[in-house]
Amino acid sequence: MADCSLRPHVHWAQRHRELYLRVELSDVKNPDVSIADNVLRFRAQGHGAKGDNIYEFQIEFLEPVEPKPVCRVTQRQLNITVQKKESSWWERLTKQEKRPLFLAPDFDRWLDESDAEMELKEKEEEKINKMKIESRVPKDPFKHLKKGYLIMYNLVQFLGFSWIFVNMTVRLFILGKDSFYDTFHTIADMMYFCQTLALMEILNSLIGLVRSPLIPAVIQVFGRNFILFVVLGSLEEMQSKAVVFFLFYFWSIIELFRYPYYMLSCMGIEWKPLTWLRYTSWIPLYPLGGLAEAVCLIQSIPIFSETGKFSLGLPNPLNVTIQFSFLLQMYLIALFLGLFVNFRYLYKQRKQHLGPKKRKMK
């Protein structure tokens, strides 16, 4: 190295397996750091003690090191990490006994040999304790069986709702508005199957197969099944209404994102576009689905009132009859309360999965 070259201030520290060099240069540009024949060579442009210039230095290490240094440039300095070939404690950094003038200990990271050994021992103990704790946790012999069941469940539901969505979309393009009025007769069997199978989601939550809370699952499953089996299934007059098309369509679109997301999660796979769709699509679709359910209830109330279906007459002097249409009006209020509970839950889930990550303060 030429005598006229500028050398930056370099601070060093060590552990049993690593060497740390902190080069006091700010705004570093074009750093060239290499190790050959156990000599580290450094050259870079940056702002040091002599202003903005090109600085360089070389260090011949006391003992063999790995030839691949790791560099990390910050606005204020450049950090170099070098791996020792053998775990040992060096009495000095350089092969030459006299310390170069530009080199000094890094007291921010400095440990003597006993401190370093204590740190190494603590890490080993922490690793051993972690292994002991993991060994104490009982292994679930049915883990793979449970995972296989959840994957198959979500796959079947995804295929079922995909069939509903594709069938309705094709019919809409071919028949136009006419497809609105016979949706129930062509789609109901598959919807019955999917919504009956959805009862398993409540069971899965009850027995702890999934970590999803129970109440949102109960609200959604029983809410949909009440509309499907009680309101639509029992009134032929409702089965030809256009609202059935929109109701089934919104339900199926929501599940096209939900079930594949859960299926991939069971396999330990995260696909970010699908995660975004899972926790974003509900924002327009859940209100639209809730609106379709409300319209369905409102249209069915006069029919239940006129036919007296499911109304209960009590044998008493006042001849009081509990009208099912009145219960539907009460249920209409409960519907919006249930939607609010699910909206709140989904909003929290969205913040958890898509919100900004909190940075830990050092």
Curated annotation (Swiss-Prot):
Gene Ontology cellular component annotations, sorted alphabetically: endoplasmic reticulum; endoplasmic reticulum membrane
Cytoplasmic side: 1-149, 211-212, 264-282, 341-362
Top-level lineage group: Eukaryota
Family indicated by similarity: Belongs to the very long-chain fatty acids dehydratase HACD family.
Transmembrane segments: 150-170, 190-210, 213-233, 243-263, 283-303, 320-340
Natural source organism: Gallus gallus
Residue numbers annotated as active site: 286, 293
Name under which the protein is recorded: Very-long-chain (3R)-3-hydroxyacyl-CoA dehydratase
Gene name per UniProt: HACD3
One MF annotation (Gene Ontology) recorded for this entry: very-long-chain (3R)-3-hydroxyacyl-CoA dehydratase activity
